[in-house]
Every structure is written in structure tokens, then in C-alpha cells.
């Protein structure tokens, strides 16, 4: 299978879903900070490939967010997501979870 076909197959099998707040966070970075926006995109790509390992110090969350995972975007901001069979469900990509 050629590279283009592999990418197309992966795109169909991996999906991103967003909460309203997470999407607003994402648009905030798009408008206000290109560097962080690019980092978020990089982390999202990596989460789709392997939601439990990689950059950003992935860690499972506890308490009310049990089942969700977090990756560090910056010292202040985290990407918080729920790994699912067909992709990830993003609940935040701005500020620290609490």
C-alpha cells in the first residue's frame, strides 16, 4: 500500500471529536498564538496514533476525570482527551485541568 493510501486509511479510522469548550480553546490558539496552536496540532496527531505514549508526558487522570488522559502543551496549559476506539474526544486544550 502506498503512503497516500495508508494516510487515507488512517484518516478514516481516526477521528477527533470536541466539546464546545475544547473547540473554543482550539480556536483561541489559532487566533492568538501560532506556536501553541502548532503544538496542540502536533499533540493531537500523536494522540491519534498512540493516545497513551509519546510527547507531552501523557498521564491518566483521576477522580472526576478518571478515564481521561492529559498531555502537557506548556507549563500552564494541558490537552485533556478521552481515548476512544475510533479516535479521541477532546475536552480541553487550554489552562490546567482542575
Which functions belong to the PLM regions below?
Residues 49-51:
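Blade/loop signatures of beta-propeller domains
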Residues 1-15, 21-24, 28-38, 42, ...:
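Enriched for short, Lys/Arg-rich terminal
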Amino acid at each position: 500500500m502506498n503512503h497516500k493510501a495508508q494516510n487515507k486509511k488512517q484518516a478514516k479510522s481516526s477521528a477527533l471529536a470536541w466539546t464546545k469548550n475544547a473547540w473554543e480553546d482550539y480556536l483561541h490558539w489559532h487566533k492568538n498564538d501560532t506556536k501553541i496552536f502548532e503544538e496542540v496540532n502536533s499533540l493531537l496527531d500523536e494522540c491519534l496514533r498512540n493516545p497513551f505514549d509519546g510527547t507531552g508526558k501523557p498521564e491518566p487522570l483521576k477522580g472526576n476525570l478518571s478515564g481521561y488522559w492529559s498531555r502537557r502543551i506548556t507549563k500552564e496549559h494541558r490537552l485533556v482527551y478521552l481515548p476512544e476506539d475510533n479516535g479521541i474526544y477532546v475536552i480541553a486544550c487550554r489552562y490546567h485541568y482542575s
